[in-house]
Amino acid sequence: MDVQPHFSLPTPIYPITLYKMIHLKEVKATIKPGVELVAVSKFHPAEVIQEAYDEGQRIFGESRAQELREKQATLPADIEWHFIGHLQPNKVKYIAPYISLIHAVDSLKLLNEINKQAAKHNRVINCLLELRVAQEATKYGMTPDECLALLESGEWRELKNVQIAGMMCMASNTDNRAQIRQEFQRARACFDEAKARFFANDPTFCQRSWGMSEDYDIAMEEGATLVRIGTAIFGEREY
């Protein structure tokens, strides 16, 4: 799918890094109040992340544990790192010391491992449950019914070093914006049911992570509190 940013891009007459930062400012101008921007920096070098940081961005999203580990060691300590990709249980130990939010928890097994590794560092790690609402077999995550069943089991309540803070999803890779909207609405309905049934008195269950470069405008209309934007900020990787 050819990703089109939601604004007209200027002719790239500036050095590549400065040109990218102009994208960051324009994207930020489109983010609604109450929504946080996760700048998806995966596959981009630390130098580009540093420039975005210098422009005021503090939340960055990565999807590979080793790559994140290397970047975290060299970049400012006050960056809020989010892990946004599929996370294998055996990789949790590499990010547990510093990760702020894990977006894509798709099983009780993974929750247990995050809890185990967080305890080693005397931390509570915030996590989002990943929903599979897209009509694509390649997407990870739980169906809404599977997600609610996990919560119904109550086993997660015994985990003292993880905090379930909300839900995450990815919409289908399609030009059909009505379909994308319906998928976000399914995710919001699941979130609302879980909130009412399991987290009614827990204000920390409040995050809805959906929307990327090509569909974040719809996501914000459908209740997103976090949008994960990479290409519209940094462009395609050219390194």
Give short role names for the model-derived ranges.
Residues 7-20:
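Short, Lys/Arg-enriched N-terminal segments with co-localized hydrophobic residues
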Residues 18-214, 222, 234:
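Conserved alpha/beta-domain cores
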Residues 237-238:
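Short, charged, intrinsically disordered terminal tails
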Residues 225-226:
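Divalent-metal-activated hydrolytic enzyme cores
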